[in-house]
Amino acid sequence: MAPMGIRLSPLGVAVFFLLGLGVLYHLYSGFLAGRFSLFGLGSEPAAGEAEVASDGGTVDLREMLAVAVLAAERGGDEVRRVRESNVLHEKSKGKTREGADDKMTSGDVLSNRKMFYLLKTAFPNVQINTEEHVDASDKEVIVWNRKIPEDILKEIAAPKEVPAESVTVWIDPLDATQEYTEDLRKYVTTMVCVAVNGKPVLGVIHKPFSEYTAWAMVDGGSNVKARSSYNEKTPKIIVSRSHAGMVKQVALQTFGNQTSIIPAGGAGYKVLALLDVPDMTQEKADLYIHVTYIKKWDICAGNAILKALGGHMTTLNGEEISYTGSDGIEGGLLASIRMNHQALVRKLPDLEKSGH
Protein backbone atom coordinates (compact mmCIF):
# COMPACT_ATOMS: atom_id res chain seq x y z
CA MET A 1 0.00 0.00 0.00
CA ALA A 2 1.46 3.33 -1.01
CA PRO A 3 2.44 5.77 1.82
CA MET A 4 -0.01 8.51 2.51
CA GLY A 5 1.14 11.92 1.23
CA ILE A 6 0.82 15.25 3.02
CA ARG A 7 -0.92 17.84 0.97
CA LEU A 8 -0.75 21.54 1.83
CA SER A 9 -3.02 24.22 0.57
CA PRO A 10 -1.44 27.29 -1.10
CA LEU A 11 -2.18 29.27 2.09
CA GLY A 12 -0.30 26.74 4.23
CA VAL A 13 2.71 26.86 1.90
CA ALA A 14 2.77 30.65 2.20
CA VAL A 15 2.58 30.52 6.00
CA PHE A 16 5.48 28.03 6.26
CA PHE A 17 7.54 30.08 3.80
CA LEU A 18 7.05 33.27 5.82
CA LEU A 19 7.88 31.50 9.08
CA GLY A 20 11.09 30.18 7.54
CA LEU A 21 12.07 33.64 6.37
CA GLY A 22 11.45 35.01 9.87
CA VAL A 23 13.70 32.42 11.49
CA LEU A 24 16.49 33.06 8.97
CA TYR A 25 16.23 36.85 9.43
CA HIS A 26 16.39 36.52 13.22
CA LEU A 27 19.48 34.30 13.09
CA TYR A 28 21.23 36.48 10.51
CA SER A 29 20.51 39.77 12.28
CA GLY A 30 21.75 38.31 15.56
CA PHE A 31 24.94 37.21 13.84
CA LEU A 32 25.51 40.69 12.38
CA ALA A 33 24.80 42.37 15.70
CA GLY A 34 27.39 40.18 17.35
CA ARG A 35 29.97 41.02 14.66
CA PHE A 36 29.25 44.75 14.93
CA SER A 37 29.48 44.57 18.70
CA LEU A 38 32.80 42.77 18.39
CA PHE A 39 34.26 45.59 16.30
CA GLY A 40 32.63 48.42 18.24
CA LEU A 41 30.24 49.26 15.41
CA GLY A 42 26.54 49.92 15.46
CA SER A 43 23.88 52.48 14.83
CA GLU A 44 24.28 55.96 16.30
CA PRO A 45 22.06 56.76 19.32
CA ALA A 46 19.25 59.18 18.65
CA ALA A 47 19.93 62.84 19.38
CA GLY A 48 19.79 63.50 23.11
CA GLU A 49 19.81 59.81 24.07
CA ALA A 50 22.76 57.89 25.50
CA GLU A 51 23.48 54.40 24.19
CA VAL A 52 22.65 51.62 26.63
CA ALA A 53 24.62 48.38 26.91
CA SER A 54 24.31 45.31 29.11
CA ASP A 55 27.35 46.25 31.22
CA GLY A 56 25.85 49.53 32.48
CA GLY A 57 26.11 51.28 29.17
CA THR A 58 27.74 54.51 28.22
CA VAL A 59 27.00 58.10 29.10
CA ASP A 60 27.43 61.20 26.99
CA LEU A 61 29.65 63.74 28.73
CA ARG A 62 27.92 66.53 26.86
CA GLU A 63 24.61 65.43 28.37
CA MET A 64 26.26 65.10 31.77
CA LEU A 65 27.49 68.68 31.48
CA ALA A 66 23.98 69.90 30.67
CA VAL A 67 22.55 68.10 33.71
CA ALA A 68 25.45 69.24 35.92
CA VAL A 69 24.76 72.88 35.04
CA LEU A 70 21.05 72.39 35.73
CA ALA A 71 21.77 70.61 39.02
CA ALA A 72 24.14 73.34 40.24
CA GLU A 73 21.57 76.01 39.40
CA ARG A 74 18.66 74.11 41.00
CA GLY A 75 20.75 73.56 44.11
CA GLY A 76 21.67 77.23 44.06
CA ASP A 77 17.99 78.16 44.05
CA GLU A 78 17.56 76.25 47.31
CA VAL A 79 20.68 77.82 48.82
CA ARG A 80 19.46 81.31 47.98
CA ARG A 81 15.89 80.65 49.14
CA VAL A 82 16.98 79.37 52.55
CA ARG A 83 19.44 82.22 53.10
CA GLU A 84 16.85 84.85 52.18
CA SER A 85 14.33 83.24 54.53
CA ASN A 86 16.93 83.68 57.31
CA VAL A 87 15.92 80.30 58.78
CA LEU A 88 19.06 78.21 58.34
CA HIS A 89 18.53 75.47 60.96
CA GLU A 90 22.28 75.56 61.50
CA LYS A 91 23.96 72.64 63.26
CA SER A 92 27.41 71.07 63.54
CA LYS A 93 28.32 67.74 61.95
CA GLY A 94 31.41 67.58 64.16
CA LYS A 95 34.84 69.16 64.10
CA THR A 96 37.25 69.74 61.25
CA ARG A 97 40.86 68.66 61.60
CA GLU A 98 41.67 72.22 62.59
CA GLY A 99 39.11 72.05 65.42
CA ALA A 100 36.46 74.30 63.88
CA ASP A 101 32.78 73.36 63.71
CA ASP A 102 31.88 71.53 60.49
CA LYS A 103 28.60 73.31 59.91
CA MET A 104 25.51 72.22 58.03
CA THR A 105 22.32 74.14 57.27
CA SER A 106 18.98 73.58 55.57
CA GLY A 107 20.59 75.15 52.52
CA ASP A 108 23.12 72.30 52.36
CA VAL A 109 20.48 69.61 52.81
CA LEU A 110 17.89 70.94 50.36
CA SER A 111 20.47 71.79 47.71
CA ASN A 112 21.98 68.32 48.07
CA ARG A 113 18.61 66.65 47.57
CA LYS A 114 17.88 68.60 44.38
CA MET A 115 21.34 68.08 42.92
CA PHE A 116 21.77 64.42 43.82
CA TYR A 117 18.41 63.19 42.59
CA LEU A 118 18.49 65.22 39.38
CA LEU A 119 21.83 63.65 38.47
CA LYS A 120 20.90 60.17 39.74
CA THR A 121 17.61 60.13 37.83
CA ALA A 122 19.31 61.19 34.61
CA PHE A 123 22.32 58.85 35.02
CA PRO A 124 21.37 55.94 37.30
CA ASN A 125 24.44 53.86 36.42
CA VAL A 126 27.14 56.31 37.53
CA GLN A 127 28.67 56.65 40.98
CA ILE A 128 27.82 59.92 42.75
CA ASN A 129 29.76 61.19 45.77
CA THR A 130 28.30 64.09 47.68
CA GLU A 131 29.26 66.03 50.79
CA GLU A 132 25.94 65.55 52.55
CA HIS A 133 24.12 62.36 53.52
CA VAL A 134 21.45 61.21 51.09
CA ASP A 135 18.30 59.99 52.83
CA ALA A 136 16.59 57.36 50.66
CA SER A 137 13.27 57.99 52.43
CA ASP A 138 13.44 61.61 51.28
CA LYS A 139 13.84 60.74 47.61
CA GLU A 140 12.78 63.35 45.10
CA VAL A 141 12.25 62.40 41.46
CA ILE A 142 13.39 65.24 39.21
CA VAL A 143 13.20 64.51 35.51
CA TRP A 144 15.58 66.12 33.04
CA ASN A 145 13.85 67.23 29.84
CA ARG A 146 16.83 65.96 27.80
CA LYS A 147 17.48 69.35 26.24
CA ILE A 148 21.08 70.50 25.93
CA PRO A 149 21.43 74.30 26.18
CA GLU A 150 22.54 76.17 23.08
CA ASP A 151 25.70 77.54 24.70
CA ILE A 152 26.88 73.97 25.34
CA LEU A 153 25.95 72.77 21.85
CA LYS A 154 27.85 75.72 20.39
CA GLU A 155 31.05 74.77 22.21
CA ILE A 156 30.70 70.98 22.06
CA ALA A 157 29.23 69.97 18.72
CA ALA A 158 29.32 66.17 19.06
CA PRO A 159 28.47 63.67 21.81
CA LYS A 160 31.36 62.31 23.89
CA GLU A 161 30.52 58.79 25.06
CA VAL A 162 32.37 57.07 27.91
CA PRO A 163 31.59 53.88 29.86
CA ALA A 164 29.25 54.63 32.76
CA GLU A 165 31.33 52.47 35.08
CA SER A 166 34.36 54.75 34.53
CA VAL A 167 32.51 57.86 35.75
CA THR A 168 32.50 59.35 39.24
CA VAL A 169 30.46 62.46 40.01
CA TRP A 170 31.43 64.78 42.88
CA ILE A 171 28.80 67.15 44.26
CA ASP A 172 29.30 70.05 46.65
CA PRO A 173 25.77 71.31 47.33
CA LEU A 174 26.96 74.36 49.28
CA ASP A 175 30.60 75.38 49.30
CA ALA A 176 31.59 77.91 52.00
CA THR A 177 28.96 76.93 54.58
CA GLN A 178 30.78 78.89 57.30
CA GLU A 179 30.56 82.07 55.22
CA TYR A 180 26.95 81.23 54.35
CA THR A 181 26.04 81.27 58.04
CA GLU A 182 27.82 84.63 58.38
CA ASP A 183 25.84 85.99 55.41
CA LEU A 184 29.03 86.48 53.37
CA ARG A 185 27.19 85.57 50.21
CA LYS A 186 29.81 86.25 47.56
CA TYR A 187 31.90 83.24 48.64
CA VAL A 188 29.07 80.71 48.30
CA THR A 189 28.94 78.31 45.34
CA THR A 190 27.35 75.03 44.31
CA MET A 191 29.55 72.66 42.31
CA VAL A 192 29.43 69.51 40.20
CA CYS A 193 32.41 67.63 38.79
CA VAL A 194 32.62 64.57 36.56
CA ALA A 195 35.77 62.45 36.68
CA VAL A 196 36.53 59.65 34.23
CA ASN A 197 38.91 56.98 35.51
CA GLY A 198 39.81 59.36 38.32
CA LYS A 199 40.68 62.31 36.06
CA PRO A 200 38.55 65.48 36.24
CA VAL A 201 36.98 66.10 32.82
CA LEU A 202 34.12 68.52 33.40
CA GLY A 203 33.32 71.03 36.09
CA VAL A 204 30.54 73.44 36.98
CA ILE A 205 30.78 76.25 39.56
CA HIS A 206 27.60 78.24 40.20
CA LYS A 207 27.30 81.39 42.32
CA PRO A 208 23.70 81.45 43.61
CA PHE A 209 23.64 85.07 44.74
CA SER A 210 24.98 86.59 41.53
CA GLU A 211 23.49 83.79 39.39
CA TYR A 212 26.75 83.33 37.50
CA THR A 213 27.73 79.86 36.27
CA ALA A 214 31.13 78.78 34.95
CA TRP A 215 31.54 75.45 33.18
CA ALA A 216 34.21 73.69 31.16
CA MET A 217 34.99 70.29 29.65
CA VAL A 218 38.51 69.00 29.04
CA ASP A 219 39.07 68.66 25.27
CA GLY A 220 35.58 70.07 24.82
CA GLY A 221 34.71 73.69 25.45
CA SER A 222 33.90 76.25 28.12
CA ASN A 223 31.95 79.41 28.85
CA VAL A 224 34.81 80.91 30.87
CA LYS A 225 38.40 81.80 30.04
CA ALA A 226 41.72 82.69 31.61
CA ARG A 227 42.71 86.31 32.14
CA SER A 228 45.14 87.90 29.70
CA SER A 229 47.99 88.21 32.21
CA TYR A 230 49.19 87.00 35.61
CA ASN A 231 51.91 88.22 37.95
CA GLU A 232 54.29 85.33 38.54
CA LYS A 233 57.04 87.28 40.30
CA THR A 234 54.96 88.94 43.04
CA PRO A 235 51.62 87.16 42.80
CA LYS A 236 48.39 87.84 44.60
CA ILE A 237 47.71 84.60 46.46
CA ILE A 238 44.20 83.61 47.48
CA VAL A 239 43.95 81.38 50.54
CA SER A 240 41.42 80.17 53.09
CA ARG A 241 40.39 82.71 55.72
CA SER A 242 41.26 80.24 58.46
CA HIS A 243 44.99 80.06 57.71
CA ALA A 244 45.82 83.26 55.81
CA GLY A 245 48.55 84.22 58.28
CA MET A 246 50.31 80.88 57.91
CA VAL A 247 50.52 81.17 54.12
CA LYS A 248 51.46 84.84 54.21
CA GLN A 249 54.60 84.19 56.22
CA VAL A 250 55.91 81.61 53.73
CA ALA A 251 54.72 83.60 50.68
CA LEU A 252 56.64 86.69 51.76
CA GLN A 253 59.78 84.60 52.17
CA THR A 254 59.28 83.04 48.73
CA PHE A 255 58.08 85.95 46.58
CA GLY A 256 59.14 89.04 48.54
CA ASN A 257 57.38 91.84 50.39
CA GLN A 258 55.29 92.92 47.38
CA THR A 259 53.29 89.70 47.49
CA SER A 260 49.76 90.11 48.80
CA ILE A 261 47.45 87.58 50.43
CA ILE A 262 43.70 87.51 49.78
CA PRO A 263 41.79 85.65 52.54
CA ALA A 264 38.60 84.13 51.12
CA GLY A 265 36.00 81.47 51.76
CA GLY A 266 35.11 78.56 49.52
CA ALA A 267 37.30 76.58 47.13
CA GLY A 268 34.99 77.34 44.21
CA TYR A 269 35.31 81.07 44.80
CA LYS A 270 39.10 80.79 44.96
CA VAL A 271 39.34 79.00 41.61
CA LEU A 272 37.11 81.61 39.97
CA ALA A 273 39.51 84.26 41.31
CA LEU A 274 42.11 82.92 38.85
CA LEU A 275 39.82 83.37 35.84
CA ASP A 276 38.19 86.12 33.79
CA VAL A 277 34.83 86.17 35.54
CA PRO A 278 32.23 88.87 34.75
CA ASP A 279 31.12 89.25 38.36
CA MET A 280 31.77 92.48 40.26
CA THR A 281 31.83 90.62 43.60
CA GLN A 282 34.65 88.32 42.46
CA GLU A 283 38.18 89.14 43.64
CA LYS A 284 41.18 88.48 41.38
CA ALA A 285 44.25 86.44 42.28
CA ASP A 286 47.25 84.90 40.53
CA LEU A 287 47.65 81.75 42.65
CA TYR A 288 45.46 79.62 44.88
CA ILE A 289 47.22 77.83 47.73
CA HIS A 290 45.75 75.52 50.36
CA VAL A 291 47.96 73.98 53.03
CA THR A 292 45.71 71.60 54.98
CA TYR A 293 43.49 68.57 54.35
CA ILE A 294 40.69 69.24 51.85
CA LYS A 295 37.78 67.21 50.47
CA LYS A 296 37.60 66.25 46.81
CA TRP A 297 34.08 67.62 46.26
CA ASP A 298 35.52 71.02 47.23
CA ILE A 299 38.11 71.02 44.46
CA CYS A 300 37.15 68.61 41.66
CA ALA A 301 35.02 71.09 39.69
CA GLY A 302 37.68 73.78 39.90
CA ASN A 303 40.36 71.28 38.92
CA ALA A 304 38.39 70.26 35.82
CA ILE A 305 37.79 73.88 34.77
CA LEU A 306 41.44 74.83 35.20
CA LYS A 307 42.57 71.73 33.33
CA ALA A 308 40.20 72.47 30.45
CA LEU A 309 41.65 75.98 30.18
CA GLY A 310 45.27 74.82 30.28
CA GLY A 311 45.80 75.44 33.99
CA HIS A 312 46.93 73.15 36.79
CA MET A 313 45.83 72.00 40.21
CA THR A 314 48.15 69.65 42.07
CA THR A 315 49.23 68.83 45.59
CA LEU A 316 51.93 71.11 47.00
CA ASN A 317 54.43 68.45 45.90
CA GLY A 318 53.23 68.74 42.30
CA GLU A 319 51.31 65.45 42.21
CA GLU A 320 48.13 65.11 40.17
CA ILE A 321 44.98 64.53 42.23
CA SER A 322 43.01 61.34 41.61
CA TYR A 323 39.25 61.55 42.07
CA THR A 324 38.74 57.93 43.04
CA GLY A 325 39.12 56.19 46.38
CA SER A 326 39.12 58.37 49.50
CA ASP A 327 37.13 61.59 49.63
CA GLY A 328 40.02 63.86 50.65
CA ILE A 329 43.66 64.73 50.01
CA GLU A 330 46.40 65.29 52.56
CA GLY A 331 49.01 67.13 50.51
CA GLY A 332 47.48 70.59 50.27
CA LEU A 333 47.12 72.11 46.83
CA LEU A 334 48.49 74.66 44.42
CA ALA A 335 46.40 76.01 41.54
CA SER A 336 47.67 78.18 38.72
CA ILE A 337 47.02 79.06 35.09
CA ARG A 338 49.33 80.47 32.43
CA MET A 339 52.30 80.07 34.77
CA ASN A 340 55.19 77.64 35.07
CA HIS A 341 53.43 75.42 37.58
CA GLN A 342 56.32 73.09 38.33
CA ALA A 343 58.63 76.06 38.94
CA LEU A 344 56.09 77.33 41.47
CA VAL A 345 56.00 73.91 43.14
CA ARG A 346 59.77 74.02 43.55
CA LYS A 347 59.51 77.46 45.16
CA LEU A 348 57.10 76.21 47.83
CA PRO A 349 58.88 73.27 49.47
CA ASP A 350 57.86 74.02 53.05
CA LEU A 351 54.18 74.94 52.79
CA GLU A 352 52.79 71.45 53.33
CA LYS A 353 54.98 70.90 56.39
CA SER A 354 53.93 74.21 57.89
CA GLY A 355 50.27 73.35 57.36
CA HIS A 356 50.21 70.31 59.66
Swiss-Prot record:
N-glycosylated. Contains N-linked glycan resistant to endoglycosydase H. Strongly inhibited by lithium. Signal peptide: none annotated. The active site is at D108, T177. This is Golgi-resident adenosine 3',5'-bisphosphate 3'-phosphatase. Mg(2+) 3 binds at E131. Pathway: Sulfur metabolism. It catalyses: adenosine 3',5'-bisphosphate + H2O = AMP + phosphate. It is found in: Golgi apparatus; Golgi apparatus, trans-Golgi network membrane. Disruption phenotype: Mutant animals experience severe respiratory distress and died within minutes after birth. At 18.5 dpc, lungs exhibit small alveolar spaces and thickened septa. The rib cage cartilage is hypocellular with abnormal, fibrous-appearing extracellular matrix. Animals show severe skeletal abnormalities, most notably in the longitudinal growth of bones formed by endochondral ossification. The length of the axial skeleton is reduced. The appendicular bones of the upper limbs, as well as the ilium, femur, tibia and fibula of the lower limbs are markedly shorter than in wild-type littermates.
